[in-house]
């Protein structure tokens, strides 16, 4: 499993928590930072999935 999948998933969770804290406390800045971090995590996780798919495809052609 590609490291980006794990790191991306962790960023998504951290971003979701930060976003929720911002929403609950009324801190729009924290809420937006959390949403941004969550989206960065989604992209990173997807990049890891693509890397895994490419790696698997290369292995299957050998």
Curated annotation (Swiss-Prot):
Q: Which domain of life is it from?
A: Bacteria
Family annotation (InterPro entries): CsbD, UPF0337_stress_rsp, YjbJ_sf
Q: Which family does it belong to?
A: Belongs to the UPF0337 (CsbD) family.
The protein, known as: UPF0337 protein XAC0100
- The species this protein belongs to is Xanthomonas axonopodis pv. citri (strain 306)
